[in-house]
From Swiss-Prot:
Protein keywords: Acetylation, Actin-binding, Cell adhesion, Cell junction, Cell membrane, Cell projection, Cytoplasm, Cytoskeleton, Lipoprotein, Membrane, Palmitate, Phosphoprotein, Repeat
PROSITE patterns, A to Z: VINCULIN_1, VINCULIN_2
Entry GO terms, CC: adherens junction; brush border; cell projection; cell-cell contact zone; cell-cell junction; costamere; cytoplasm; cytoskeleton
One protein family per Pfam: Vinculin
Name of the featured protein: Vinculin
Protein source organism: Sus scrofa (Pig)
Domain of life: Eukaryota
Notes concerning its domains: Exists in at least two conformations. When in the closed, 'inactive' conformation, extensive interactions between the head and tail domains prevent detectable binding to most of its ligands. It takes on an 'active' conformation after cooperative and simultaneous binding of two different ligands. This activation involves displacement of the head-tail interactions and leads to a significant accumulation of ternary complexes. The active form then binds a number of proteins that have both signaling and structural roles that are essential for cell adhesion.
Region (3 X 112 AA tandem repeats): 259-590
Post-translational modification: Phosphorylated; on serines, threonines and tyrosines. Phosphorylation on Tyr-1134 in activated platelets affects head-tail interactions and cell spreading but has no effect on actin binding nor on localization to focal adhesion plaques. Acetylated; mainly by myristic acid but also by a small amount of palmitic acid.
Length: 1135
């Protein structure tokens, strides 16, 4: 099957596929219509010459290369493409003498398919060899990084730096060239991110090595911390380079592998957090006098939170046990806290409950450890299999290979057996074990032949190829087993989870592999995490909302399982669940915004205080104690920043890339924090040491840069206006605290309150500054900048007034001056917030008072008569709009029920938007802008009520034909998104709807359902044409958008579309060559279909994201833009 993970391969295969598609259509016309096939000797001769040239270049490369794998894999590709070319030549010769020859037509179609497949194989083999060149450079850097461990003198360090630099430069250049060549955006991003991390870590590595050498040679204190810093940096760089090597070898986006890696890291982190909190939690449970809500109880809540995260990453019985235990222990902890709050902490009931919670925490920890161990074992085995199979392939390619290759295969089989033993599905386990037996027998036979010196015989070569294929199949089976051991994955961002949940709520009877319920569980889990840091009634309120959603979800799932998912009771439950989810979402976002406002009000003070403690003079009192305290504060602060950022990613309005950016920055912060503390401790123990100071500054700046990046991403993830509202409310509360402090003569409390106000005001200035930099709208920039300047001028006077009143807190005059300063800050904050308010539309003036109207009994003058002899023509009747009825099922007709149901839904959607009189949609005034603030139609004309947006082509959706359901589901998903908007005056929506309908048609054609090869090829071309239109229009919108962030998002999404649509044309041609053919294996045909399905899903998802981003960009359009799109909701938000 063709792969096109590089632009070069795609650019070569596209014209080949285009020519093949012409031959396929000719074949079909001859086969179906009986048409004579024209003389093809000239074009076939051209193809033969091109193929001969390709094979010649390939053979020359094979003769000169030292790459054994290239030497092994190229000859079969040569044979394949040459045989295909021979068939084409024979077909052309036979058709020249008999244009109606049936065998010639068969040779034509088989030769065409072979040319496309063989060319793809040749190009892929060449590309893999190029990748291996890059990997060799990467592995050279990896090996040289280990040399850092033996560098112990400054001379060695200088030599090491000189040698490492050129290799790094070469690797960076090769990676940059490679990422530009890739067509998968995810792979490009991963390569760029990993390479950037390696570049950023290089000066840190040199700094860490320098401080290690310095402390070791001077025999100063801190050598242990220096060693930790150096080893951490080497390990981090090695991990990133290994990730580069892994991504370089990918030809498709492996979401499961990426998810498994992140899940393993998350489980390990959760387990470490549980272990660190366990003693504190148990101490609180043992002490009946401990206060409810203090650090001990919070430790229990955090343990349950971390265990819950692990439970969410498990499946089946393991998941139920962990989450069930968490819920039970949470309820029991509530009971213990309640008893202690009532002064009954020492009662037998409270003591018993506390002991049960303590024992339960041990049980829960053991369950989490088992889950983490199982996932890690399966993931490690999977990675080990990949490495061993890679080494085994080299052995299989070398006829004279030694016994080590056989050992690699045996090792891979042993790892695969471990995965099989951990499988919950017996069918999956037996399938893997069966493959192990087959591969073991084949390997033994091949090893015997090689021991006899017959490794180069045709039999041995065939066996080597057979073993290589079987190993690849085994790897696929083990990868699938690891993926299936994890639960259905919900989207990483809030809107994605809501959409997945909504799809399931709308149709709970459809099997979505549990994704919809997983999305709801994910939302509820985030709700619990937010509640854990809240106090009193706020926590109970959020927990109650979570429990309500849980309860309704379970009830709806139960009805669906009993086959009553469409019953009136189920529909009522679905409506309640929708409302409860909306309520939960709003409450979670409110709580998260408040937490971000509090935690991110000041991100750098703790690390600055740590720097002050680390540079304290040697004779400073309590120097060590102060440092330890500030180091602990810094670590706690960093942990809070990370936890809050994760909540913002999960509950905010961020897109997938922002969420992943937050997760990456949080991970980096967690890794860097202990390294910063180690660097600070080295400086503390080596006062005046310049190398120690420079190293600490390097680590500190890296931490600050990462946190600034995290802060920016968090700000992107939440609504700016909501953050400003929350900050304004927090400043009001701080002012109230200051009033209390002045009334109670508490200067320290006053200073704390004033400091908090200043920090929050500065945070607002930072947010405003970022938004000004992000916008190109001059009016908005001027308004925000003016309000920010005014706020900036109020901060210093307030701080000065606070200092004055703290020095003489009883002075009423000073108190009044301070409060006036505080209120001035509040007023300035309000003006900043108002600058972010969307402009209200200018409403028409109200009608005049009826009493002022002058009404008389005088009749209006008669109309002038028509010119003599003319008769007015009768008014023609309005064109009758037909609502075609959906075809009913005939008696005895066997239909595809899911397909019929999907088509009925689309038909009903079409009828909703009919403007036919009497239709309920027409009565509510479809076409009127639904949003009260008119945000969705800024700058666009409001359509008339009578405007018709009916689309009869929706009824062309297939009804009873066999279809490919995944492609249809992708088309429906895009169609649902597009039908939220009227297509009148909006070419993007019109093109998106066309694409959805065309893709639904393709879903019928790919299985050969009453369609033709020509129809399939033409359908793909039409989809590509509509794709180009969507891309062109999206780029026009991006050009006029004043919001840089939204513009970038839109361009990133829409630029994926042309590549995917080109691939769709090629894959459709491949599939067309297989339709109606009996000499194609089921496996080959299914593989072609799977690739087509995956491509269709990617295309529909990219267009859907483009529609959303284009709508967001249209709100921020230039006022002088000549290019406009009209965004009018068809379904008002209030319905």
């Amino acid at each position: 099957m063709p792969v096109f993970h590089t632009r070069t391969i795609e650019s070569i295969l596209e014209p080949v596929a285009q020519q093949i598609s012409h031959l396929v259509i000719m074949h079909e016309e001859g086969e179906v219509d009986g048409k004579a096939i024209p003389d093809l000797t000239a074009p076939v001769a051209a193809v033969q010459a091109a193929v001969s040239n390709l094979v010649r270049v390939g053979k020359e490369t094979v003769q000169t290369t030292e790459d054994q794998i290239l030497k092994r894999d190229m000859p079969p590709a040569f044979i394949k493409v040459e045989n295909a070319c021979t068939k084409l030549v024979q077909a052309a010769q036979m058709l020249q003498s008999d244009p109606y020859s049936v065998p010639a037509r068969d040779y034509l179609i088989d030769g065409s398919r072979g040319i496309l497949s063989g060319t793809s194989d040749l190009l892929l083999t060449f590309d893999e060899a190029e990748v291996r060149k890059i990997i060799r450079v990467c592995k050279g850097i990896l090996e040289y990084l280990t040399v850092a461990e033996v560098v112990e003198t400054m001379e060695d360090l200088v030599t090491y730096t000189k040698n490492l630099g050129p290799g790094m430069t070469k690797m960076a250049k090769m990676i940059d060239e490679r990422q530009q060549e890739l067509t998968h955006q995810e792979h490009r991003v991963m390569l760029v991110n990993s390479m950037n991390t390696v570049k950023e870590l290089l000066p840190v590595l040199i700094s860490a090595m320098k401080i290690f050498v310095t402390t070791k040679n001077s025999k100063n204190q801190g050598i242990e911390e220096a060693l930790k810093n150096r080893n951490f940096t080497v390990e981090k760089m090695s991990a990133e380079i290994n990730e580069i090597i892994r991504v370089l070898q990918l030809t498709s986006w492996d979401e499961d592998a990426w998810a498994s890696k992140k899940d393993t890291e998350a489980m390990k982190r959760a387990l470490a957090s549980i272990d660190s909190k366990l003693n504190q939690a148990k101490g609180w449970l043992r002490d009946p006098t401990a206060s409810p809500g203090d650090a001990g109880e919070q430790a229990i809540r955090q343990i349950l939170d971390e265990a819950g995260k692990v439970g969410e990453l498990c499946a089946g019985k393991e998941r139920r046990e962990i989450l069930g235990t968490c819920k039970m222990l949470g309820q029991m902890t509530d009971q213990v806290a309640d008893l202690r709050a009532r002064g009954q902490g020492a009662s037998p009931v409270a003591m018993q409950k506390a002991q049960q919670v303590s024992q339960g925490l041990d049980v829960l920890t053991a369950k989490v450890e088992n889950a983490a161990r199982k996932l890690e074992a399966m993931t490690n085995s999977k990675q080990s299999i990949a490495k061993k199979i890679d080494a085994a392939q080299n052995w299989l390619a070398d006829p004279n290979g030694g016994p080590e290759g056989e050992e690699q295969i045996r090792g891979a089989l042993a790892e695969a057996r471990k995965i099989a033993e951990l499988c919950d599905d017996p069918k999956e386990r037996d399938d893997i074990l069966r493959s192990l037996g087959e591969i073991s027998a084949l390997t033994s036979k091949l090893a015997d032949l090689r021991r006899q010196g017959k490794g180069d015989s045709p039999e041995a070569r065939a066996l080597a190829k057979q073993v290589a294929t079987a190993l690849q199949n085994l790897q696929t089976k083990t990868n699938r087993a690891v993926a299936n051991s994890r639960p259905a994955k919900a989207a990483v961002h809030l809107e994605g989870k809501i959409e997945q949940a909504q799809r399931w709520i709308d149709n709970p009877t459809v099997d979505d592999r549990g994704v919809g319920q997983a999305a709801i569980r994910g939302l509820v889990a985030e709700g619990h995490r937010l509640a854990n840091v809240m106090m009193g009634p706020y926590r109970q309120d959020l927990l109650a909302k979570c429990d309500r959603v849980d309860q309704l979800t379970a009830q709806l799932a139960d009805l669906a399982a009993r086959g009553e998912g469409e019953s009136p009771q189920a529909r009522a439950l679905a409506s309640q669940l929708q409302d409860s989810l909306k309520d939960l979402k709003a409450r979670m976002q409110e709580a998260m915004t408040q937490e971000v406002s509090d935690v991110f009000s000041d991100t750098t003070t703790p690390i600055k205080l740590l720097a002050v403690a680390a540079t304290a003079p040697p004779d400073a009192p309590n120097r060590e104690e102060v440092f330890d305290e500030r180091a602990a504060n810094f670590e706690n602060h960093s942990g809070r920043l990370g936890a809050t950022a994760e909540k913002a990613a999960a509950v905010g309005t961020a897109n997938k890339s922002t969420v992943e950016g937050i997760q990456a920055s949080v991970k980096t912060a967690r890794e860097l924090t202990p390294q910063v503390v180690s660097a600070a401790r080295i400086l503390l123990r080596n006062p005046g040491n310049q190398a120690a100071y420079e190293h600490f500054e390097t680590m500190k700046n890296q931490w600050i840069d990462n946190v600034e990046k995290m802060t920016g991403l968090v700000d992107e993830a939440i609504d700016t206006k909501s953050l400003l509202d929350a900050s304004e409310e927090a400043i009001k509360k701080d002012l109230d605290k200051c009033k209390v402090a002045m009334a109670n003569i508490q200067p320290q409390m006053l200073v704390a309150g004033a400091t908090s106000i200043a920090r929050r005001a500065n945070r607002i200035l930072l947010v405003a500054k970022r938004e000004v930099e992000n916008s190109e709208d001059p009016k908005f920039r001027e308004a925000v900048k003016a309000a920010s300047d005014e706020l900036s001028k109020t901060i210093s006077p307030m701080v000065m007034d606070a200092k004055a009143v703290a020095g003489n807190i009883s002075d009423p005059g000073l108190q009044k001056s301070f409060l006036d300063s505080g209120y001035r800050i509040l007023g300035a904050v309000a003006k900043v917030r108002e600058a972010f308010q969307p402009q209200e539309p200018d409403f028409p003036p109200p009608p005049p008072d009826l009493e002022q109207l002058r009404l008389t009994d005088e009749l209006a003058p008669p109309k002038p008569p028509l010119p003599e002899g003319e008769v007015p023509p009768p008014r023609p009747p309005p064109p009758e709009e037909k609502d075609e009825e959906f075809p009913e099922q005939k008696a005895g007709e066997v239909i595809n029920q899911p397909m019929m149901m999907a088509a009925r839904q689309l038909h009903d959607e079409a009828r909703k938007w009919s403007s036919k009189p009497g239709n309920p949609a027409a009565k509510v005034g479809i076409g009127v802008v639904a949003e009260a603030d008119a945000a969705d139609a800024v700058g666009f004309p409001v359509p008339s009520d009578m405007e018709d947006d009916y689309e009869p082509e929706l009824l062309l959706m297939p009804s009873s034909q066999p279809v490919n359901q995944p492609i249809l589901a992708a088309a429906q998903s895009l169609h649902r998104e597009a039908t939220k908007w009227s297509s009148k005056g909006n070419d993007i929506i019109a093109a998106a709807k066309r694409m959805a309908l065309l893709m639904a048609e393709m879903s019928r054609l790919v299985r050969g359902g009453s369609g033709t090869k020509r129809a399939l090829i033409q359908c793909a071309k039409d989809i590509a044409k509509a794709s180009d239109e969507v891309t062109r229009l999206a780029k026009e919108v991006a050009k006029q958008c004043t919001d840089k962030r939204i513009r970038t998002n839109l361009l990133q999404v829409c630029e994926r579309i042309p590549t995917i649509s080109t691939q769709l044309k090629i894959l459709s041609t491949v599939k067309a060559t297989m339709l109606g053919r009996t000499n194609i294996s089921d496996e080959e045909s299914e593989q072609a279909t799977e690739m087509l399905v995956h491509n269709a899903q990617n295309l529909m998802q990219s267009v859907k994201e483009t529609v959303r981003e284009a709508e967001a960009a249209s709100i921020k359009i230039r006022t002088d833009a000549g290019f406009t799109l009209r965004w009018v909701r068809k379904t008002p938000w209030y319905q």
